Structure formats: C-alpha cells, structure tokens
C-alpha cells in the first residue's frame, strides 16, 4: 500500500473485505518510491505471495474487493479445484459510481499448497503469475463466476488521478 489515504484508495473497505476471507492478510508496497514504476508491481506481488502462509493466495490490489455475498460461494468453488494452479475471476472496473466496464478475467487466486514455484514475472509489465515460464492467464486457467470489483479511480479527485 503506497499512500492509500492520499491516493483516496478504498483501503479500509478492502482490508475489511479480506478479513472476511482469511486472517492471513499480507500487506506489501509500503516501501515503494512515490513515483510508480511498472517493474515494481511484479516484485510487490511476488513478495506478497512468498509471505503468504495459506494453501491458496488471493492476490488483490488495495482498490479491489469481493462482494460480501460472494465470499461463501467463492470459498466453496475454490475447494472444487484442488489441482488447479490458479483461478481467474471477472474484473468489473469502476471509473465513476455509474460508469464501469467488465475489463477482463484476472488471475488472482493461486494454489500455493501445490505450486509453491509460481512467480510473478510474466506479461508486458512482468506482474502476471507464471508456472514453469508459462503465463497463468485467462486462456490457461479455470474461471469462476465470482467478480472482483475494482474501484480504481472511483473515489479520487481529478488532481489525484493526474498525479497517479
């Protein structure tokens, strides 16, 4: 988390959401420089994965939430796929309260119990998870019908967005 208060990220809401899923919450990114660099993203995700202690790692940024009514469904569905290395969820990206798009499927759930060697070094920004040098993206992993809600710029002022 890099200056979530200043950036007007919904960090309190996100942490409450994560607490409803697990007690193993890993926060990374506090030491990042103010100026964002894309190559920091994969390193930060890897640090979070490495520090996580659970069988499954749910890799969500501080502006991404799961709806409280979907938590039980998600946990039940994950248990159906113990041999999958990763699972993708549809990402609904909000720009404003009434303006959003279904952006893509995000590979955010990773099976650390069976696949400890997952690395975040894939894709153009070197932040996508890989297994044996194969990117674990929407074309290679299982999809679940439980959306991730991304509130990217929803609560930010135009000035904050311009700085970011």
Language-model segments: which ranges?
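Active-site-proximal specificity loops/subdomain of glycosyltransferases
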Residues: 1-59, 70
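Catalytic-site signature of metal-activated, phosphate-bearing donor transferases
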Residues: 39-46, 65-164
